[in-house]
Amino acid sequence: MVSTSSYQTTKSKEIFTAAQKLMPGGVSSPVRAFKSVGGQPIVFESVKGAYIRDVDGNEYIDYVGTWGPAICGHAHPEVIAALHDALDKGTSFGAPCVQENILAEMVIDAVPSIEMVRFVNSGTEACMSVLRLMRAFTGRDKIIKFEGCYHGHADMFLVKAGSGVATLGLPDSPGVPKTTTNNTLTAPYNDLEAVKALFVENPDSIAGVILEPVVGNAGFIVPDAGFLEGLRELTKEYGALLMFDEVMTGFRIAYGGAQEKFGITPDLTTLGKVIGGGLPVGAYGGRADIMAMVAPAGPMYQAGTLSGNPLAMTAGIKTLELLQRPGTYQYLDKVTKSLTEGLLKVARDAGHSVSGGYISAMFGMFFTGSPVHNYEDAKKADVAKFGRFHRGMLERGVYLAPSQFEAGFTSLAHTEADIERTLAAAKEVLASL
């Protein structure tokens, strides 16, 4: 464990101070600025396995995993070797490559809902594109999303969003016209009756329902029994589409994602993070008859200069090959169980009211004793206490997501020894809060 007396981040502070004159807020994505946990962010120098090293030489056990992609651990040697081989052939083609076919076949084989897939460059791009597709296929304009669920920063989704929007305490974003979000209906997550009411009020105008099947962008929140099943039934009843945003859960909570885990098959799915092995990537796919609407096969236009990038495809292929190996998800479940149950126990033993849980390689803990079923429940958590907890863990060599409203991630590189060190640090920090 790192000695708190020797912990310093002088170089990180200098770099971040300079960055604030060069980039808005000093970062390329808001949550990285540590606004919800106080202090200034650490600047990374390198990552390897379950560890990150900052520019001041401090080493941390990492439970952010570059926000989800690093399920095999950072800089996995087999992924790096595959990338070296691909790099010699060029960084970008802007044309078809065989790696697209290989990764597409792997995704289609793995994800129950996907019969055809289109690769893009980010989760935001995937969700933005699939929303257009839902509207094109149904001829309807309205969508239902859930409070606290985050589907990227496209205008139509910035209504009661989670992730960085929740971190900053913003209900939406300036610059988004009301006309853009007029067709975005919202309901509390896990509230099937609220969804039913929206369908009753708009029986012929809802194109579909979009959600994180397991919420990771308002903290870690699981679906109540019957919730996903109820959504599937409602969308079928009203002729609407069901879309799972599995950018975070895809290949993480099961090889086939949340839809495999819960046995509910949506019409469409978005993916990202894991399928790029740490490189920028996104994808959307679903039923062949719906995907046939996408250009150039159909009239719904969507394109991208770097889509299907050979390096991203290569990293994704090797990552999925690693995940196919026997015992992968059993191991992820084991280490995440030890971590999550251990954190909850040491927190409660120290007199703190907490709740939380995990599924495979995804977990979360809220500083509230009440069960968290939706975004409103999540907002009752003690954000200030989480900020102090985060800082204490950082000083002891443990890097957690810098927001109460983000899920945590484990990887195949995490060991039981890493978990023990983490719990020892947590015990020390929680005793002092």
Swiss-Prot record:
Cofactors that this protein relies on: pyridoxal 5'-phosphate
In-chain residues carrying the UniProt-annotated modification N6-(pyridoxal phosphate)lysine: 273
GO-annotated biological processes: chlorophyll biosynthetic process; protoporphyrinogen IX biosynthetic process
Gene3D superfamilies: Aspartate Aminotransferase, domain 1 (3.90.1150.10), Type I PLP-dependent aspartate aminotransferase-like (Major domain) (3.40.640.10)
Matching InterPro entries: 4pyrrol_synth_GluAld_NH2Trfase (IPR004639), Aminotrans_3 (IPR005814), Aminotrans_3_PPA_site (IPR049704), PyrdxlP-dep_Trfase (IPR015424), PyrdxlP-dep_Trfase_major (IPR015421), PyrdxlP-dep_Trfase_small (IPR015422)
Entry's EC annotation: 5.4.3.8
Family: Belongs to the class-III pyridoxal-phosphate-dependent aminotransferase family. HemL subfamily.
The protein's name: Glutamate-1-semialdehyde 2,1-aminomutase
Organism of derivation: Microcystis aeruginosa (strain NIES-843 / IAM M-2473)
Gene name as annotated: hemL
